[in-house]
């Protein structure tokens, strides 16, 4: 029996820098990449493309089970490919966001997508970006990292991102939203946002992104050399 391809899981709250870290690690190691946060949006978009009713669990399950999606990181940019087409921009529309929240509510859809996410595990290896990658999706991953940062730092980063896009934002409101989301995520009954017992907890509050990438790659290479 062939050994399963290695997986590096990167979990953590919104705004900690998971996406940037995962893209950098996938490029550095030349591994596959899974952006689990985007997968419900991709399924929602596939349903809209194929005129599948997003309110029908029965109709969505087979679509979820055979979802043709890939994630490609090039020069720090993430391309989301659905059925051979780059849909990176399309999955960010409000219509798709609304549909994604509907499809995510169905238990059988979540189960089908769990199996679909596990199918990303292919040689030479996988970088899995999410919130429950190390605890639920890939509990046997040889390398698990939980990337964290203070809520204030994450609000600051989000504010700068939005300002760069021309949006006017209120820091206190952003901070309040982040704290509320953290509370929901950490205390939910199913797959709460907690570090796996065997995860390295990496606090990025006072680190540059280059320092985070360096520490994560160093840790991963050490662990994989021992595995």
UniProtKB/Swiss-Prot annotation:
The entry's keywords: ATP-binding, Cytoplasm, Kinase, Nucleotide-binding, Transferase
Main location: cytoplasm
InterPro entries, sorted: Cytidylate_kin, Cytidylate_kinase_dom, P-loop_NTPase
Name of the protein described by the UniProt record: Cytidylate kinase
EC numbers for this chain: 2.7.4.25
GO molecular function terms attached to this record: ATP binding; CMP kinase activity; dCMP kinase activity
Binding site for ATP: 12-20
GO biological process terms held by the UniProt record: nucleobase-containing small molecule interconversion; pyrimidine nucleotide metabolic process
Subcellular location(s) per record: Cytoplasm
Top-level taxon: Bacteria
Pfam hit, one: Cytidylate_kin
Gene name of this polypeptide: cmk
Keyword ATP-binding belongs to the record: yes
Catalytic activity: CMP + ATP = CDP + ADP; dCMP + ATP = dCDP + ADP
Family to which the UniProt record says this protein belongs: Belongs to the cytidylate kinase family. Type 1 subfamily.
Listed CDD domains: CMPK
GO cellular component: cytosol
């Amino acid at each position: 029996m062939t050994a399963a391809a290695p997986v590096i899981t990167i979990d953590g709250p919104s705004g900690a820098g998971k996406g940037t870290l995962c893209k950098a690690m996938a490029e550095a190691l030349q591994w596959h990449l899974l952006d689990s946060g985007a997968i419900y949006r991709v399924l929602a978009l596939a349903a809209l493309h194929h005129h599948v009713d997003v309110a029908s669990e029965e109709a969505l399950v087979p679509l979820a089970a055979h979802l043709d999606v890939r994630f490609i990181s090039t020069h720090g940019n993430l391309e989301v490919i659905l059925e051979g087409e780059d849909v990176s921009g399309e999955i960010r529309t409000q219509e798709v966001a609304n549909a994604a929240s509907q499809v995510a509510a169905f238990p059988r859809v979540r189960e089908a997508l769990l199996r679909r996410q596990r199918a990303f595990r292919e040689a030479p290896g996988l970088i899995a970006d999410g919130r429950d990658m190390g605890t639920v999706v890939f509990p046997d991953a040889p390398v698990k990292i939980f990337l964290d940062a203070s809520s204030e730092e994450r609000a600051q980063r989000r504010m700068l991102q939005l300002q760069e896009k021309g949006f006017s934002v209120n820091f206190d409101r952003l901070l309040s939203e982040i704290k509320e989301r953290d509370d929901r995520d950490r205390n939910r009954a199913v797959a709460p946002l907690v570090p796996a017992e065997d995860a390295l907890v990496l606090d990025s509050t006072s680190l540059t992104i280059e320092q985070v990438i360096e520490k994560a790659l160093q840790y991963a290479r050490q662990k994989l050399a021992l595995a």
